[in-house]
Amino acid sequence: MEITALIGSELGVSRWIEMSQERIDSFAECTEDRQWIHVDRERAARGPFGTTIAHGYLTLSLVAGTLAEVVGDRLGSAMALNYGIDRLRFITPVRSGARVRNRVVLQSVEPKGAGKVLYSMACTMEIEGDDAPALVATVLGLAAG
């Protein structure tokens, strides 16, 4: 099946990924974003979320790996590069210990010449047991080769 036939279709849903406190702490160290809502368990327990929460950018960073999992080699290229993100919104904080997954819908396919193709995918990072997603974004990928 040609990939353009899948425009408007759900490509799939990734596996659930636990947002452990260890993952959050590691991200805080890597990015030097050690705000108390992320790393101070005692203070966060008294805060608005009742526990620590993941950085929005940590949740966003999981999009790359989950996209690779969902899309796999269906794009028919040797490699895919991050091209950009449109309409990114952080909707619901992800509490420590929660699980997230990525639901992916192919929005568009645009040939860019020289064997390159620009793909636009609607990504929704869902939180297990929550009606509202963690984030929504239109993710752009450039496939080549």
Regions found by a protein language model. Give the residues of each.
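Hydrophobic beta-strand-centered segment that forms part of the acyl-chain substrate-binding groove
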Residues: 48-51, 64-105
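Catalytic strand-loop segment that frames the active site of acyl-thioester-processing enzymes
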Residues: 1-54, 68, 145
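A generic structural signal for short beta-strands and their flanking turns/coil linkers
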Residues: 13-15, 23, 33, 77-86, ...
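Hydrophobic alpha-helical segments of small multi-pass membrane proteins
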Residues: 58, 83-90, 121-127
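HotDog/MaoC-like acyl-thioester-processing domains
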Residues: 2-6, 93-145
